[in-house]
Each structure stands twice: as C-alpha cells, then as structure tokens.
A protein has these predicted regions:
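C-terminal accessory region of radical SAM enzymes
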Residues: 1-22, 47-97, 103
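Cysteine-cluster motifs in flexible loop/terminal segments that predominantly coordinate metals
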Residues: 87-131
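Conserved short histidine dyad/triad with adjacent acidic residue
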Residues: 25-27
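A cytosolic small-molecule/anion-sensing beta-strand core signal
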Residues: 44
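Short, small/polar residue-rich loop motifs at catalytic or cofactor-binding pockets
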Residues: 33-36
Length: 132
C-alpha cells in the first residue's frame, strides 16, 4: 500500500517521475512480492517462517530439511495462500483496484487484528475513493 500511496501523491502533484515510479512498482511486484514470496525468515533455531513477523507459523526447519525443499513445498496452506493471495482476500482488499500491486498489504497484521489472514489490512490508509 505504501507504493500505491506514493504513486497517487506523485500523480496529485503532477510529478514528472510518477510514471517511472509506477513502472518500478510493477517491475518489482510491489507488496505482492512479500511474505512467503520474496521474503522468508530463518530464526536462530533454524525454523523457517514466511517472514520475521510470522514467528507463530513454522514451515519447517533447515536443520532437518534444506531451505529449498521447505520453500518449494506446496503442502503448507498458508504459504500456498500467501503465494496466491488475491482470490483469498476479503472486504475492501478483495475489490481494491490496486490489489495486483499492493497484494493486500500485510497479511500477518490482518491475522493478528482479526484472526483471518485474508481479511483487510487494518492499517490500510488508502481511502475508499482511492481504492475504487
């Protein structure tokens, strides 16, 4: 959501580099290339998590299996969901026009706030008008 917000502000200010900013967001995958996709965490005990904030969700241990085997194992429903999250998103995230770039923002925050990792990110500061 941060990248989208920045892009919208640049458009609002008619900044000459707004288009280039958008192209970089698309190239990098924005927030959609985050937890469980482009980010992982291995804690001091060797446990693998979707990122450093998912400490309560263990995908495996690198002392027992190679990281590559853990990271490419599609048996974990949360990891599979994080990698294919768009159809799972609910609420305003499900209808947000920026979901391809934002990726529903921070899924662990949604989980901690609502008990549902696919619920809207409660910290999304984009207005309803901005996401419509």
């Amino acid at each position: 959501m941060d990248g989208v917000y920045l892009y919208l502000k640049l458009l609002e200010q008619r900044a000459p580099h707004a288009r280039q900013t958008w192209e970089l967001l698309e190239w990098n995958g924005g927030g959609a290339n985050s937890s469980g996709v482009g980010i992982a965490n291995i804690d001091s005990c060797g446990n693998v998590h979707p990122d450093q904030f998912w400490q309560t969700h263990n995908l495996g241990n690198v002392r027992e299996r190679p990281f590559s085997a853990i990271w490419t194992d599609n048996a974990d429903p949360l990891l599979t969901g994080l990698r294919n999250r768009l159809p799972l998103l609910t609420g305003r995230c499900a209808t947000c026009r920026w979901q391809e770039t934002c990726g529903g923002s921070f899924r662990v925050r949604a989980l901690q706030a609502t008990g549902d990792p696919w619920a809207p990110d409660p910290a999304c500061y984009l207005t309803d008008e901005e996401i419509a």
